[in-house]
């Protein structure tokens, strides 16, 4: 069901914000692959499965220049929380990376051919109360969605 819904939303050029499984779904549906188990297949050097609670940061990501994430935050790094065992392995051809963890995992992506299709591997919805930067991610999505709705 989710892949069919995503296909419809992308064809309709509606704003998309994919979080955790959402970034993974975006990547898989657009032709990318996933690590099914980071510890077995990738051997991370960052904490990607922090213990609860998830309202604090566990590692930083490096933000790629000339990307929507850089435009939203206007900084080079961001501290993020992390609680996943799957992640992007091979990036889908249509997606562009916006941030990487220090051990090289893609942590944020966007689809440049669409108005607003963004994915984050971390959980900004769990940390935004303690981090204005994560709140900015939602404010940006709401602003774009509102503009899209009014068009």
Q: Can you annotate each of these PLM segments?
A:
Residues 1-53, 59, 68:
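Cysteine-nucleophile active-site neighborhood
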Residues 20, 84, 123:
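Active-site glycine-centered loops adjacent to acidic/histidine catalytic or metal-binding residues
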Residues 65-113:
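Catalytic beta-strand/loop cores that center a nucleophilic Ser/Cys/Thr
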Residues 106-128, 136-137:
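A glycine-centered loop/beta-turn motif at secondary-structure junctions
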Residues 140-144:
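C-terminal alpha-helix
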Residues 147-151:
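Conserved small/polar residues in nucleotide/adenosyl-binding loops
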């Amino acid at each position: 069901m989710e892949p069919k819904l995503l296909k419809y939303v992308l064809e309709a050029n509606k704003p998309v914000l994919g979080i955790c499984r959402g970034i993974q779904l975006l990547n898989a549906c657009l032709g990318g692959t996933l690590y099914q188990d980071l510890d077995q297949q990738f051997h991370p050097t960052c904490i990607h499965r922090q213990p609860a609670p998830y309202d604090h940061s566990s590692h930083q990501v490096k933000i790629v220049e000339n990307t929507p994430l850089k435009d939203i935050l206007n900084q080079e790094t961001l501290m993020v929380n992390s609680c996943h065992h799957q992640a992007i392995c091979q990036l889908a051809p249509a997606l562009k990376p916006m941030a990487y963890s220090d051990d090289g995992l893609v942590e944020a992506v966007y689809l440049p051919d669409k108005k607003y299709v963004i994915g984050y591997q971390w959980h900004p919805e769990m940390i935004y109360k303690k981090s204005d930067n994560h709140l900015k991610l939602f404010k940006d999505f709401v602003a774009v969605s509102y503009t899209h709705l009014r068009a």
